[in-house]
């Protein structure tokens, strides 16, 4: 890694907001380290600033810990300037309803909180040293559903984003 250029970690970067966020940092010359459940899109591998992508299940605490270890290895003692906790989930029940207080399996609530709340907490702690070295910032991507009732967000998602 080039310690002269700034470095960012972006979660949930294989598509959507996370992918576009990663592209924005790339366009500005930052080195990026990303993770998502899926492999990075092939066009990302062609960009020399895309330092590494680590397939990670942020809903699994062991996988999160592995990502922290591997990403810190990629940093090689260099500072981290930003952590973008973007990954999130809003599952539906088997009946295609958003997971709410009165429907769905309670284990699904655990899964939502593991990914939407505990993973960002673990990542923030896991990168605290590198962030301090780079005087970095943590950005937790939440949702309007965490602040206001939203018809397309279930209770589990909304409450987990409020907690974050």
What are these regions (language model features)?
Residues 28-43:
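Conserved glycine-rich Rossmann-like NAD(P)H-binding loop of the short-chain dehydrogenase/reductase
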Residues 94-110:
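Substrate-binding pocket helix/loop in short-chain dehydrogenase/reductase
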Residues 124-125:
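A short, exposed helix-loop element centered on a Lys and neighboring polar residues
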């Amino acid at each position: 890694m080039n310690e002269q250029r700034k470095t960012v970690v972006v979660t949930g970067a294989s598509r959507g907001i996370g992918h576009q966020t990663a592209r924005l940092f790339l366009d500005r010359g930052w080195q990026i380290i990303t993770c998502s459940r899926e492999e990075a899109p092939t066009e990302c591998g062609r960009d020399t600033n895309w330092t590494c992508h680590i397939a990670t299940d942020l809903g699994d605490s062991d996988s999160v810990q592995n990502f922290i270890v591997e990403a810190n290895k990629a940093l090689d003692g260099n500072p981290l300037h930003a952590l973008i906790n973007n990954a999130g989930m809003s599952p539906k029940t088997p009946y295609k309803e958003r997971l709410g207080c009165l429907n769905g399996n309670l284990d699904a609530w655990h899964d939502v909180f593991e990914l939407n709340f505990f993973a960002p907490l673990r990542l923030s702690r896991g990168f605290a040293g590198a962030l301090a070295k780079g005087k970095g910032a943590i950005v937790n991507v939440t949702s309007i559903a965490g602040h206001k009732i939203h018809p397309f967000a279930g209770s589990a998602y909304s409450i987990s984003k409020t907690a974050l």
